[in-house]
Amino acid sequence: LKAERVESGFHVERASFTVSLPSKLKGKYDMAIANFGVPLYGATLVGSFKYPKTDQDGCAEFDANAFNTNSSYGANIMLLNRGECPFTTKAFFAQKAGAEAVIIVDNIAEDLITMDAADDAESQEYVKNISVPVALITESVGEKFEEELSAGNAVIATLNWTDVLPHPDSRVEYEIWTELTDSCGAKCDAQVGFLNDWAPIAKELETKNYTQFTPHYLTWSCPEGYEDSDVCLSECINHGRYCIPDPDDDLYSGYSGADVVVSNLRALCAFKAANDSQIPTKWWDYITEFQSSCKMSTGLFNSYDCAETSMKRAGLDTSSWKNCIGDIDANSENAMMEEQIIAQSPPSESTRSSVRILPTVVINDVQYRGKLARGEVLKAICAGFPNDLRPEMCSDSGLINDKCAQGADGWNTCLSDPDKSGETTCSTTSAFPYYECICPKGLHSEFSDSLNTWSCVSVQQTARSVGKTSTVLASVFFSLLVLVTCLFLFYRWKMKQVMNQEIRGILSQYMPLDDDEMEEEEDTARLNAGNDSSSIRLGRSGSPTAMFG
């Protein structure tokens, strides 16, 4: 029997803010970091609170006079009431109206809670576009600020994320908790996209010994006595020990929860194989290959052969991998899955928080809150280093900021102008390498064989080039047409000569022909050949003497 243990529970990740004005509200307050938006890890933000005159729940677009965004007190920090619509809707409309941070006031007398985004497509679309920090404060604290702001008084505060993440040493340890399902809509698409986007950064950080990464997957156990139920048989492996909810909510068709557990287990064992090989970054090669080749939509998600092929392409040993996976039908524990249960639900004496939200990033044992995106997660990881030990990637010229900034990779590649045309420009993108070289208005990309690269050419130049090319092509076409016509006429003349010789040879077998008669017969043959392509009539009486098919 398993021993009962007390879990540490879910921790609300907090930051703080300090009010400097008015004096009666002066002090330090806690705020709960939302699981979306962009917390400014390692930084502070000074500004003034704004409270809209109407639509104080922020569930619709604000009109131009809702609040004054022109402030001499720094950033615009929007204060909104909880309720009536999702948190993501409030944050998006506030940001659109000019807010540089959003604070939502709870409408229930309770402790701080973590705000999360819903799984529906609209909420996930908002999540992708929210680029400001979002947090929640308690009802009692928020009412004080709303009262002061409604009276027309200013409230000046400094939001602080500098001490959110600990930085105990020169190496940051982080975990990524995801799920391998790829058919749950926008949320799954975002997770798959993030892992592919993050892979090159993770490999570089790990190779240079800046970080130590560990992948994790959530699991749950079937309640005792229900191991043989339809639910547990479909969603669990190892006799109900490790389960995941059915990905399509259909126990009797499609992929099962057990399929997902097995895929997660294979990924965990791939990570073990990568560590055993002394090249842990090979796990990223496995997971990106698996996500690309073994999709649910292609019917290969639960294919052992597909997963094994991904292992081989990543250069990992498959024999130890098979042993690690073990017998999923056995009524026994699996060491890799037991590690997941302990990590997601630490004992009460642990300082770690239980993992309950997917996806979750844990940095130095503290759960990251915010948008699951390359730049935002990198900023948080960089905040986990001591200031004097941060890798170059965390600097202004690193991946953390604009890749088209002067001195960055994009600038060096695009604006350094390898073709000396002075026309190439750089644009940032959301996917690795996070920039692309594009052409300004009036120009288009054209490949240079001599430079083996793309460069920008004006549309007018292209038009002239196209015009010249068209003229040359027209001349060539006309010449070919004349040549074909001449060849056709020569062919017809030659065929007539051959036909005349054959006619003369045949007629000579029946009657002697002098030259005049032969010419007459030839004229008759030519005339009749023109009237009937399938036969030639000969003889003075008009009776058929020969027929040619």
Where is each model-derived feature located?
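Loop/turn elements at helix/coil->beta-strand transitions in domains of secreted/extracellular proteins
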Residues: Y73-I77, A97-A101, S170-Y174, T207-F213, ...
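Extracellular/luminal ectodomains of secreted and membrane glycoproteins with large N-terminal domains
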Residues: K50, M78, C85, A91, ...
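Typically the conserved alpha-helix immediately C-terminal to a functionally engaged Cys/Sec
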Residues: C184-T207
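Disulfide-rich extracellular modules and peptides
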Residues: E61, A186, A190, E224, ...
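Structured lumen-facing ectodomains of secretory-pathway proteins
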Residues: K2-C188, Y217
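Conserved N-terminal segment of EGF-like repeats
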Residues: G384-F548
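Short, solvent-exposed loop/turn and secondary-structure capping segments
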Residues: K90-A91, I113-D116, A186-F194, E224-D228, ...
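Cysteine-centric redox/oxidoreductase cores and disulfide-bonded domains
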Residues: W220-A405, K468-S470, L481-V484, R492, ...
